Amino acid sequence: MAKHTTSVPTQWIFLRGLVRESGHWGPFVPFFESQVPNARVHLLDLPGNGALYTLTSPTHLKAMVESCRQQLRNAGLDPPYAVLALSMGAMVAVLWAHDYPHELVRQVLVNTSMRPYSAFYERLRPRNWVTILALLARTLLRRATGQQWEAAVLRMTTSGHHPQVLQAWLLLRTAHPVSTANALRQLCAAAIFKAPARRPLVPTLLLASTCDGLVSVRCSRGLAHAWQVPLLEHPHAGHDLALDDPHWLVQQLCHGGVTSGR
């Protein structure tokens, strides 16, 4: 795969989704940096996840945006930034772009969903409800194991075969356990967030998996239609595009079109 060196932002922020952490990007980060030599990736965790797992997760995304900005200030990293954000992380990016458009030069939103452009049964496909409710019930009865949870998440979010990933995710779960209370608080924040009616002032690209088993591709299609921003679809990858097809994702990050509201 040819390296990409032109017209690509140099300072990237990567954000994951609900109860996921920066470690879940796995080998995609070094792969991206190897393909885009001038780019530097900064991984952020949302409060309650990853290195910040001991903090209380906010129930509003505004506080998550401010946490991201504070983490970057603490690290001495000044804007502007480009953002790659997955799922709930994309909601954080959208609010960031709305409140502080001068800080972002590009946002790439992957397999996300937002009110009022997505129905509740599109934001989480009904076939996953039984799995999640069963695991929650077993968790309350102290019968669900971490391996059962992570294996279920892997099945719901990927379309490929990734046996090595499960062990890596179990290690992350042990190192940075997300509390049930924080998971519910994050779910609340994602559920009540309402996307701005006006398309972002920041150049925006939507990426989605046509066969996403977790979130319906209709969510990204609805957002693309409402905002009149480009949407590129992967024909067979699952929700976790970075895991299922990192080559395709890098290609879109470097050459996919973006549209600005300016």
Language-model regions: role of each:
Residues 85-89, 93:
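Gly/Ala-rich beta-loop-alpha elbow adjacent to hydrolase catalytic centers
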Residues 237-250:
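Catalytic histidine-centered segment of alpha/beta-hydrolase-like enzymes
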